[in-house]
Amino acid sequence: MGRIHVLSEHVANKIAAGEVVERPASVVKELIENSLDAGAKRIRVHVEAGGKKLIHIVDDGIGMFRDDAMLAFERHATSKLKNPEDLLSISTLGFRGEALPSIASVARVRLETRANEEPSGTVLEIAGGKILKIEEAGLPLGTSIAIKDLFFNTPARKKFLKSESTELSHIASLVTHYALAHPEMHWELHSATNALLIAPPVATQSERIYQVFGNETLDQLIPLAAQIKLERIGLPKPPPWLRKNEDDEEEQTVEPGEVRLHGFISKPEIQKLNRNSIFVFVNGRLIRDRLVQHALTEAYRNILPPTLFPVVLLFLEMPYTEVDVNVHPSKTEVRFRQQSLVHDFVRDSVRAALSKARPIPQFISEIHAQPKASPSLTPGAQTAPAFALEAQEEPVLPERLQFGGDAISVEANAAVPVARFGAQTFGSHVAQQQTVPETSGCDYELPDLPAADAPLASLRPLGQIRESFILATSNEGLWIIDQHVAHERVLFEKVLKQRAAASVETQQLLMPLIVELTPGQQAVFTEIAEELHQNGFEVEPFGSRTFAVKAAPAGIRAEDIEKTLSEVLDSFEREQQAFNLEHAQSRIAATIACHAAIKVNMPLTQDKMEWLLAELAKTEHPMTCPHGRPIVLRYSVKDIQKAFKRI
């Protein structure tokens, strides 16, 4: 007896569901695209338990006839394609006929639909791929489809779903994408507890951006519009002896068309921790294409730090024959016929828009100095050589080194510049004040590294390099300490201890700070609201997706409170793991410490440097900051002796 057999249709549908239905957001995506293909002008999405318990989508599209409603749940049944040639120019969002049968095979489905020409509608109920009921009913024009108990018959798939807030944030992000792409439509997203998004139709995309992100984000966006002619490329003609007839010798000339790009890109002042705010559509289709992502990365190179991302809303439009959307089960990846042309066009168009707007990145700013903190580090007549442990000409030193003195002032909201510099040979004069980069976002990897054996408590601070790095000495050699990340480690462990003892220090705001959250951030906030409160944030609802911050952790400047809260929510929004309380506490503490810590380009007195080194020595892990960056560099006496050729 043979070993190979044909799978039953029921099993085949479950396998297909594994490709199409990855999570609740995948179901929402397929159903929304069906509604858009049906010409809907109003779409309402309601979910419960992050979509695990219920996904209910209602639209006012053209609806379906009774026979079509039944046929729609058959595999590869579609109204979008008829001939093989149609695959070469797909103009609809759906076309395979896989989504509905795949969803119905792993969930309980109730479909209510009525076409405009029909006096009554059709109600269809399916569970696990089996039709339970079909009947006529009086229904409004359009379609309503409810998906209950997703993966109820495949527990192995269900256990791999993330927390309710994580799944809800994915759904919120998806609906936000389509709401931005279709400002002419009415969109609603509701969870079991509140409304995450209500966006009435508007005339322009900028008005829709205002609805979703608020006026502050809109003011930081740059409009973009560009177009380019496509090149005429194709397969070479066959030689004359292989042509079927002489009439085919001259091929009909067809204009290749144009590629058009329009939308909005953000100035460098807006910096996100993840790519969730990058919205790219190709012919109205939401994509996550590596080619376009790389083009955007190249366009923002040397403008944004490599670990941070812009806000982007871009629409690529081109002939349907120039893009293949049938390359991935979820249809989020595409293949362009002229990849290099599309990549360079996107990159150069974004660069040109940034250059035309002449934005001044927030992390490049000047230091307005008073008298310098240390006479020995004041500008001199000679240019400072690069730092090296190689023998050089002996610099002219003052008779006596002094540290301390008056401090300089930094503007309250002056951001951190990005400028390369060479460190000094110890004791040389500094020719001019230069600035040092500081990471303006936080990468939330929290390694648990062992504490170093170095006797940090015995360090004696000598001064600062660029008012950003503390130079210290001990019997073991020369030490360089990054003052920002050192203080960050001190504050991180302090916040965790205060949280454990329920004695977190807070600061009451004179006036509540009004913060508007995105739908995805609001979904995360619902999950971690109590933990935020335990860490010093006092936040109350103040309308739809708007919250009033009345108190915040002590040490965070007033102008940084909104950014701190936003970074916390964004970091959880990109989280792929189930919610873990201990991990959440560490993540929130790390973000608070990052924003409350001493900054670079900040002068410190001798007492402050001694205090910081003493506090760092008391921490459990003094060698790395909470995000994994090194805190200290050490040059041993032996290394220095080797550099001077003494051993």
Swiss-Prot record:
Highest taxon above the source species: Bacteria
Which cysteines form disulfides?
Answer: none
| Keyword DNA repair recorded | yes
**Any single Pfam family the record assigns to this protein:** HATPase_c_3
Q: Does the keyword DNA repair apply?
A: yes
* Keyword entries, A-Z: DNA damage, DNA repair
A biological process from GO = mismatch repair
Any one Gene Ontology MF annotation carried by this entry is: ATP hydrolysis activity
Q: Which PANTHER family match?
A: DNA MISMATCH REPAIR PROTEIN MLH, PMS, MUTL, DNA MISMATCH REPAIR PROTEIN MLH1
- Function of the protein: This protein is involved in the repair of mismatches in DNA. It is required for dam-dependent methyl-directed DNA mismatch repair. May act as a 'molecular matchmaker', a protein that promotes the formation of a stable complex between two or more DNA-binding proteins in an ATP-dependent manner without itself being part of a final effector complex.
The entry's family comment says: Belongs to the DNA mismatch repair MutL/HexB family.
Q: What is the protein name given in its UniProt record? A: DNA mismatch repair protein MutL
Organism in which the protein naturally occurs: Koribacter versatilis (strain Ellin345)
